[in-house]
């Protein structure tokens, strides 16, 4: 007989639409929902950027010569290219309508994470320190609710060799980001030798199904029942060191 073994809930929270720069305590808003012990709170990075002043006024952007030349090669707006360059540590690859960069955070992604989607006016950059943002929000929510939670700041990115975007964790607090399961046993009692699970990325992708990419208006998702280990994980734990990157070496 088949029986239920575990149930995981993914709960999307609708918040007001923010244009950027509002003086809002996000933790207090989220804490209005009945949070439970063990909840994982996933927050879209766009919302964090808006509230942390990460939306740049287009009128204040003056494209450099490099940005103008790169805009010609890619077909992108020179002002957008300038912001991409400002947020990049290294340009990895350039093509028609894309610039793959390594950001100052160490993320390798398209366009340094710079985006204009779901932005009222201006150009959005990634949060300056997503791990720090996640930590601050987690501590505030735990203080407000008395519950132990994890917080993930998520972004959606494309992947090499596969089509489509998926959610990933760029900021993490309160849970493991990378779950090392070496030494545990499989179903047949064999010891796991190399298994590391990017559990924070998996949770971010789960949340992204509910958040969506268009006009869903769900920037915060609660994942309940996932049974994820608490810990001191960080989003940066998921970044492969450049010297271990077989594609760039």
UniProtKB/Swiss-Prot annotation:
Example of a GO MF term: coenzyme F420-1:gamma-L-glutamate ligase activity
Residue numbers binding a divalent metal cation 1: 115, 155
Keyword Cell cycle among record annotations: no
Pfam families: F420_ligase
Cofactor detail note: Binds 2 divalent metal cations per subunit. The ions could be magnesium and/or manganese.
The enzyme's E.C. designation: 6.3.2.31, 6.3.2.34
Residues that coordinate or bind a divalent metal cation 2: 156, 213
Temperature dependence: Optimum temperature is 60 degrees Celsius. Thermostable. Retains 70% of its activity after heating at 80 degrees Celsius for 15 minutes.
Cofactor: Mg(2+); Mn(2+); K(+)
Keyword Transcription regulation assigned: no
Keywords of this entry: GTP-binding, Ligase, Magnesium, Manganese, Metal-binding, Nucleotide-binding, Potassium
Amino acids binding GTP: 15-18, 45-46, 50, 118, 211-218
Pathway of action: Cofactor biosynthesis; coenzyme F420 biosynthesis
InterPro entries, A to Z: F420-0_g-glutamyl_ligase, F420-0_gamma-glut_ligase-dom, F420_ligase_CofE_arc
GO biological process: F420-0 metabolic process
Stretches of the chain forming a coiled coil according to its record: none
Activity dependence on pH, as recorded: Optimum pH is 8.5.
Catalytic activity reported: oxidized coenzyme F420-0 + GTP + L-glutamate = oxidized coenzyme F420-1 + GDP + phosphate + H(+); oxidized coenzyme F420-1 + GTP + L-glutamate = oxidized coenzyme F420-2 + GDP + phosphate + H(+)
Subunit-level organization: Homodimer.
Stored PANTHER family: COENZYME F420:L-GLUTAMATE LIGASE (PTHR47917:SF1), PTHR47917
Function in brief: Catalyzes the GTP-dependent successive addition of two L-glutamates to the L-lactyl phosphodiester of 7,8-didemethyl-8-hydroxy-5-deazariboflavin (F420-0) to form coenzyme F420-0-glutamyl-glutamate (F420-2), with a gamma-linkage between the two glutamates. Cannot use F420-2 as substrate to add more glutamates. Exhibits maximum activity with GTP, compared with UTP (66%) and dGTP (25%); with ATP, only F420-1 is observed as the product; CTP and TTP support no activity.
Family designation: Belongs to the CofE family.
Cross-referenced HAMAP family: F420_ligase_CofE
Name this polypeptide is given: Coenzyme F420:L-glutamate ligase
Source organism: Methanocaldococcus jannaschii (strain ATCC 43067 / DSM 2661 / JAL-1 / JCM 10045 / NBRC 100440)
């Amino acid at each position: 007989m088949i029986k239920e073994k575990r149930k995981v809930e993914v709960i999307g929270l609708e918040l007001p639409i923010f244009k950027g720069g509002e003086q809002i305590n996000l933790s207090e808003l989220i804490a209005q929902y009945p949070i439970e012990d063990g909840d994982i709170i996933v927050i879209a990075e766009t919302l964090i950027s808006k509230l942390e002043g990460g939306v740049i006024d287009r009128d204040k952007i003056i494209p450099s010569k490099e940005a103008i030349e790169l805009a010609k090669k890619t077909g992108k707006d020179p002002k957008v290219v300038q912001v991409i360059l400002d947020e990049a540590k290294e340009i990895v690859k350039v093509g028609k309508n894309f610039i793959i960069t390594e950001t100052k955070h160490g993320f390798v992604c398209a366009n340094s994470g710079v985006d204009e989607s779901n932005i009222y006016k201006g150009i959005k950059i990634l949060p300056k320190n997503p791990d720090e943002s996640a930590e601050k929000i987690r501590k505030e929510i735990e203080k407000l609710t008395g519950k132990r939670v994890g917080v993930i700041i998520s972004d959606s990115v494309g992947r090499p060799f596969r089509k489509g975007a998926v959610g990933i964790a760029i900021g993490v607090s309160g849970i493991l980001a990378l779950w090392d399961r070496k030494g545990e046993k499989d179903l047949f009692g064999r010891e796991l030798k190399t298994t590391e699970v990017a559990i924070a990325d998996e949770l971010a992708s789960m949340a992204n199904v509910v958040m969506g990419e268009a006009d869903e208006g769900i920037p915060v998702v609660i994942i309940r029942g996932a049974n994820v280990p608490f810990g001191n994980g960080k989003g940066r734990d998921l970044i492969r060191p450049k010297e271990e990157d077989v594609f760039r070496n």
